[in-house]
Design a protein with these regions (language model features):
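Active-site helix-to-loop segments that bind/position phosphate- or nucleotide-bearing substrates
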Residues: 22-146
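Conserved active-site and cofactor/substrate-binding residues in soluble primary-metabolism enzymes
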Residues: 65-68, 72, 149-152, 156, ...
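Generic secondary-structure signature for well-ordered alpha-helical cores
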Residues: 75-82, 166, 170, 200, ...
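Long, amphipathic alpha-helical coupling/dimerization segments that relay conformational signals between
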Residues: 136-186
């Protein structure tokens, strides 16, 4: 598997965490929270407006035949999707979370006042990759629309997990932040390595990283959320929440 990996620990080794120490931390589930598989990945009805946004529509009219094409492509994407989820809840003052070495002001702000963090990863599976590859050869217009549908679908799965988790956390009398992914704001993209390794995404849901940090399958999401005893204002979705946008 060299060249395709879940987590290559050069970064952590450079920061003083050797592989053996990391493996011990991973096994210490009592202190660091077991990898969870009790909550199912849910793909529900796709939001047509989101699909249109991915396609570049901003409220303008479009022909009936385009609508039919979108509906057909959406059905094919939903049929091909095999959503999978893995997540882990752990204390922010624990050794495992500290070993993640998450950098940046934005993630510190997100987790300020939080006693726990949730690491999550979701994917639509390889069936979507095959569908997109096939359509890119046979019908490029379909390929563009299917890509938009698949992007909407993976966000749908991530949103549904966040919704379900929020309900679970609120039953405990606690509060959940919104999710924050590597590459957002000033959280480096290389944090993907740490998240995928901590969640064992390769074995759990078939999610790997390329040497250039691209997720395989491509329609996948990793993210971090915080759990606090006090409510926290949720950030706006999109570029407005990014420190790079504000600077």
């Amino acid at each position: 598997l060299r060249g395709w990996f879940v987590g290559e620990w050069r970064i952590s080794i450079r920061k003083g965490i050797c592989i053996d120490e990391w493996n011990v931390l991973m096994r210490d589930e009592a202190a660091n929270g077991a990898v969870q598989e009790d909550m199912k990945a849910r793909l529900t009805e796709l939001n047509e407006n989101e699909i249109l946004l991915y396609l570049g529509y901003r409220g303008q009219e479009y022909p009936a035949e385009i609508r039919k094409q979108i509906e057909r492509c959406e059905r094919e994407v939903v049929t091909a999707a095999q959503p999978r989820l893995v997540w882990r809840r752990l204390p922010v003052d624990g050794e495992l979370f500290s070993a993640l070495h998450l950098e940046g002001k934005d993630i510190r702000e997100l987790l300020e006042g939080c006693s726990e963090a949730v690491l999550m990863a979701v994917t639509l599976g390889q069936g979507i990759e095959r569908l997109l590859a096939k359509s890119s050869v046979s019908n490029m217009a379909d390929a563009v629309i299917m890509d938009a549908c698949a992007s909407t679908a993976i966000e749908n799965v991530a949103d549904n997990f966040e919704f379900d988790l929020r309900g679970e956390v609120e039953e405990e009398g606690k509060y959940l932040t919104d999710r924050f992914s590597p590459g957002y704001g000033d959280l480096p993209l290389f944090s993907q390595r740490q998240l995928c390794a901590a969640l064992d995404t390769g074995r759990k849901i078939g999610l790997l990283l390329s040497p250039s940090l691209l997720m395989i399958p491509g329609k996948s999401v990793t993210a971090i959320l915080g759990i606090s005893d006090e409510p926290k204002a949720l950030r706006k979705r999109g570029c407005e929440s990014c420190s790079l946008f504000r600077s």
